[in-house]
Amino acid sequence: MTKPIRNVAVLGATGSIGAAALDVLARHPRQFHVSLLAAGQRVDALLALCRTYRPDHAVIGDATLYTTLRDGLNAAGLATKAYAGEAALAELVASTTCDTVVAAIVGAAGLHSTLAAARAGKRLLLANKESLVLAGMLLMREASISGAEIIPIDSEHNAIFQCLRSRTTDGVHRVTLTASGGPFRGHNRTMLAKITPTQAMAHPTWSMGPKISVDSATLMNKGLEVIEAHHLFGLPSEQIDVLVHPQSLVHSLVEFIDGSTLAQLSLPDMRTTLAVGLAWPERIGSGVQGLDLMKHNRLDFEHPDTETFSCLRLARDAMQTGGTAPAVLNAANEIAVSAFLQGRIGFLTIPALIEHALTTLPRYEADTLETLLTVDTETRRITHAALTHFPLPL
């Protein structure tokens, strides 16, 4: 029997993960229809995607760009309806417009639409790690109530998901997330003090956006992923390890209590995990070639240097503290990374600002969205204010 076409919303469509998702979707027009595209401010790029994919709806996050979007769609002769703002996106995501949501909006800005998809019982391909870090308990609770199917798109969590064939962790002894080590693996703090934004965005194996590239360079990306794994799979910190694996071919390992270890290997390309999420439990072509072990025949592993790259340690500390501490970590990191990319602070000031926020703000129970958003706002305020107290980049 022919399966119905899945209607897919791609949030963060103009970013690197959005582009990868659309590439996979375009390969399977009989299985998927792009029903909604959403972007933050890149209205021209969103219009170009609308001309290619002809979605039913398009949303621009910046409400001041609504007229540009609407007029551009009309000029192109498209029937695509234009919307603007966070509330409009959340309403569309929760409606019958889509049954599958690729949540790839970077940062806390993606939280409302991600929660809306979870509450509405959608299949949620989760690439917005900040939603789990900021509000993981709430997100997983909403998904449990509604029956939403959360499939992680980060390569590490997707690998664990595949090894477990679900999110059930019965019989698991521990999981190991791998990290490339970023472009500065082996650097000391003296060397890191001179790092520029351009250098930090030059990731050795993955093609990613600016913010995620910097997070990878500081190892904050891996710290956030430890917190994600805790929420996604219900594992305590002591059952979540991290190893640096510069080849980025082994994406995670799952060790079971019987001594067995399963690992997922593939070339570093987000289209693989997106194809898994879109078709699961079936498999579809992603456009990614299989792994040639004769060509890629070296696999190295080492422990991360958490003294030099302290963001990973700070993330673990925030997870152990619990409550609103991960929300503070996330918000302070977003402000610090943005300031670094603007050339306002040095590379080593990123963890310093995060630690300042974690030690300054009190811990509260993370039991409501209102509490989390209040803490997020306050963290951004004090981190912004602290920027002037740290030395300028060298």
UniProtKB/Swiss-Prot annotation:
A Gene Ontology molecular function term of the record: manganese ion binding
Spans traversing the lipid bilayer: none
One biological process term in Gene Ontology: isopentenyl diphosphate biosynthetic process, methylerythritol 4-phosphate pathway involved in terpenoid biosynthetic process
Enzyme kind, highest EC tier: oxidoreductase
Pathway stated in the Swiss-Prot or TrEMBL entry: Isoprenoid biosynthesis; isopentenyl diphosphate biosynthesis via DXP pathway; isopentenyl diphosphate from 1-deoxy-D-xylulose 5-phosphate: step 1/6
Top-level taxon of the source organism: Bacteria
Family: Belongs to the DXR family.
Keywords, comma-separated and alphabetical: Isoprene biosynthesis, Manganese, Metal-binding, NADP, Oxidoreductase
Organism for this UniProt entry: Xylella fastidiosa (strain Temecula1 / ATCC 700964)
HAMAP family cross-referenced by the UniProt entry: DXP_reductoisom
InterPro entries: DXP_reductoisomerase, DXP_reductoisomerase_C, DXP_reductoisomerase_N, DXPR_C, DXPR_C_sf, NAD(P)-bd_dom_sf
Cofactor or coenzyme needed: Mg(2+); Mn(2+)
NCBIfam families: Dxr (TIGR00243)
UniProt function note: Catalyzes the NADPH-dependent rearrangement and reduction of 1-deoxy-D-xylulose-5-phosphate (DXP) to 2-C-methyl-D-erythritol 4-phosphate (MEP).
Keyword Oxidoreductase: yes
Gene3D superfamilies: 1.10.1740.10, NAD(P)-binding Rossmann-like Domain
UniProt keyword NADP, yes or no: yes
Protein name as it appears in the record: 1-deoxy-D-xylulose 5-phosphate reductoisomerase
Catalytic activity reported: 2-C-methyl-D-erythritol 4-phosphate + NADP(+) = 1-deoxy-D-xylulose 5-phosphate + NADPH + H(+)
Positions contributing to Mn(2+) binding: D154, E156, E225
EC number: 1.1.1.267
Positions of 1-deoxy-D-xylulose 5-phosphate binding: K129, S155, E156, S180, H203, S216, N221, K222, E225
Chain sites annotated for binding NADPH: T14, G15, S16, I17, G40, N128, E130, G209
SUPFAM superfamilies cross-referenced by the UniProt entry: 1-deoxy-D-xylulose-5-phosphate reductoisomerase, C-terminal domain (SSF69055), Glyceraldehyde-3-phosphate dehydrogenase-like, C-terminal domain (SSF55347), NAD(P)-binding Rossmann-fold domains (SSF51735)
